[in-house]
Amino acid sequence: MGKEKIHISIVVIGHVDSGKSTTTGHLIYKLGGIDKRVIERFEKEAAEMNKRSFKYAWVLDKLKAERERGITIDIALWKFETTKYYCTVIDAPGHRDFIKNMITGTSQADCAVLIIDSTTGGFEAGISKDGQTREHALLAFTLGVKQMICCCNKMDATTPKYSKSRFEEIVKEVSSYLKKVGYNPDKIAFIPISGFEGDNMIDRSTNLDWYKGPTLLEALDQISEPKRPSDKPLRLPLQDVYKIGGIGTVPVGRVETGVIKPGMVVTFGPSGLTTEVKSVEMHHEALQEALPGDNVGFNVKNVAVKDLKRGYVASNSKDDPAKEAANFTAQVIIMNHPGQIGNGYAPVLDCHTSHIAVKFAEIQTKIDRRSGKELEKEPKFLKNGDAGFVKMIPTKPMVVETFMSYPPLGRFAVRDMRQTVAVGVIKSVEKKDPTGAKVTKAAIKKK
């Protein structure tokens, strides 16, 4: 066995009819972990329903449908391998909760793959009516997804087919708006593809011999290696807390930054509860240490299940321990709110695993969301498309951090009326010092 490949996450974005499902389905189909029997079953069903043309998207639709019905899909189905990486596709958008998942999501995407419909009319639709293309690209950039690959899809259906001039026209236009969002187009690979026919997806296409750049597979291999934040202090937001007979209390969550290991004394924010970690395990195997990206359960001493909750954050008691936020200031972008948002607005914030109502105490400034320049001091309200700096006060104890220090704990979705109405990035946090927090015997011994 050679060294295991590096894991990276990609998020596929673009307008609703751009061919995201077909393209993603094709990659997973050709390079992925989908069992051949499953594919044959899908193909048979697709043929029976005269959906032959829909083969790759059909694979993805079946996976989505099964996942939405709560049938746990083997997550390997959403993975594929390149020569250098194991790639996981983060929730393909179009899914209702895509924006929320991208923000609070189990993982930060390392690269966005933007799919553009190159057909006449298709491209214009995706880009114009404030199509989702812009919104998704802005979102990816705001949330720190700095690498991008842009696929000009449906090249088999341009007029004439595989048109070089159409490709060049699209590259020019898309470059100019990605630049407005904040990306540097010179660092983005633009690839003419057909997700359905397979041109330039994995193998070089003879239909596009005028194109000299990388195929999609080669471009994915050229993504620069993500740096995992294991050198930062520990932050592990809890997803659940279990009581396991014979073992005791076992909090479960994903290490976002730093490391956790047996013997470490951890402090849980916001309550300040401090105790010793007895053991750490992943997939039923004991670990000597867990690193960022690992989903782990860990056993803590002298702690009742009721003392810990989803949304609490485990941290190293000796290294910048997590504390309750008294208030924080964030850059907020309003994305789909039907009215006006003024001081006193109190929606729910989804930040890492916590889900807590937060009050917009003071809208400090309205800013240009691309350049960050101030447009207005203390505006009365913010509406759709606006961005601003807002001071926020949680209605219940919660842990948040600045996006600079701990990115996964510094971005959030604002939820109201069952949808994501805004996204935000935290710039500064005022923390409370815990008073009278419980320190277990095990932790005192370790001191």
Swiss-Prot record:
Its main location: cytoplasm. Residues 14-21 are annotated as: G1. Keywords: Cytoplasm, Elongation factor, GTP-binding, Methylation, Nucleotide-binding, Phosphoprotein, Protein biosynthesis. The modification 5-glutamyl glycerylphosphorylethanolamine is found at residues 289, 362. Residues 194-196 are annotated as: G5. GO terms for cellular component: cytoplasm. Transmembrane segments: none annotated. Coiled coil: none annotated. It is found in: Cytoplasm. The modification N6-methyllysine is found at residue 261. InterPro entries: EFTu-like_2 (IPR004161), G_TR_CS (IPR031157), GTP-eEF1A_C (IPR054696), P-loop_NTPase (IPR027417), T_Tr_GTP-bd_dom (IPR000795), TRAFAC_GTPase_members (IPR050100), Transl_B-barrel_sf (IPR009000), Transl_elong_EF1A/Init_IF2_C (IPR009001). Residues 153-156 are annotated as: G4. The keyword Nucleotide-binding applies. Pfam families: GTP-eEF1A_C, GTP_EFTU, GTP_EFTU_D2. The modification N6,N6-dimethyllysine is found at residue 55. GTP binds at residues 14-21, 91-95, 153-156. Residues 5-230 form the tr-type G domain. The keyword Protein biosynthesis applies. Residues 91-94 are annotated as: G3. One of its GO terms (molecular function) is GTPase activity. Residues 70-74 are annotated as: G2. Belongs to the TRAFAC class translation factor GTPase superfamily. Classic translation factor GTPase family. EF-Tu/EF-1A subfamily. This protein promotes the GTP-dependent binding of aminoacyl-tRNA to the A-site of ribosomes during protein biosynthesis. This is Elongation factor 1-alpha.
